[in-house]
Amino acid sequence: MKKKYNISIVGQSNTGKSTLINYLCDKYVSAESKKLQTTRVNLYNSVSLNGMEINFIDTPGVSLQNNDLLSTSMKNAYIKTLESIDLLLLMIDIDNIDLKYEDSILDLANVAKTNVAMLINKIDLAEDDLSELEVLKSRISENYSLELYFMSLKSKQGVTQMVNGICKILETKPPLNNKNIIPVNQKIISMQEIIRGVIIELTHGDVPYDTAVHIETHVTKKKIIEINANIYVNKDNQKKIIIGKSGSMIKKIGIESRLKLELIHGKQFYISLKVLVKENWKNNYILLKEIGYID
């Protein structure tokens, strides 16, 4: 019987967390974007590596500045996750290093006595100045006692070494929690996040960050999955943007969402989308709980 381990991937937005998940799972399972707040809830994906079953948890890129209820729930996800994982992977973008942020995460990990490995991504951006990598390596080694991996998900440089390294870390101790920690509504939440990921890519300004998706109903049949979902926005003008001229944008969102979901689930999808204005929804406890942003 394979040992089951739980690994959480954390880091600021746009460090490559979702890209790493998709690479390890060898398929598209998590929305990727250069924009902030691509991931708002923990997303779970299992994969077999080196004879072990590893459950990767893609966590939100938390904004430490925002104080709305949504941001608070995202921050709380960090703390709750730390209580049930075997290893924390802290991802850093080599082109955007702010160790003050990392310090706050490492402090939480230290309190929870969680093993940590630091992944420095996008080293291809520093290929012309290798001395920069050595300086960074020395700087981190002087301040932190943890495993350190330099890699590039774009060029795949250092990725194999990183995977082998984290597996060796896990092999040194038995799993902390061999039980299934994946929420029962994870499938629905992941569908919602895929649709929201499409909206993020197709819209601009404040629209991507003021949008939430909630699947009201879903019916799974033999060959097709039917879902009816609401898209929530803060303002009337945002609703107009989501719908688009003569419904062009909402149609495009539906088509691209359907294609991504069919690729992931291997079934046909029928998607019905409705756009609703819900002012200040980020502080609406009931709605956030219905969507799955709050347990």
Outline where the language-model segments fall.
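Catalytic P-loop NTPase motifs of RecA-like helicase/translocase cores
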Residues: 39, 63-64, 97-98, 126-127, ...
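Conserved glycine(s) of the Walker
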Residues: 16, 158, 249
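Active-site phosphate-binding and catalytic loops of NTP-dependent enzymes
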Residues: 30-33, 174-178, 201-212
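Conserved G1/Walker A P-loop phosphate-binding module
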Residues: 1-82, 87, 231-232
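Canonical P-loop GTPase G-domain recognition
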Residues: 114-117, 124-187
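Conserved C-terminal guanine-recognition region of P-loop GTPase G domains, centered on the G4
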Residues: 47-54, 73-147, 219-224
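Cofactor-binding loops of NAD(P)H-dependent oxidoreductases
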Residues: 59, 92, 151-154
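P-loop NTP-binding site
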Residues: 187-295
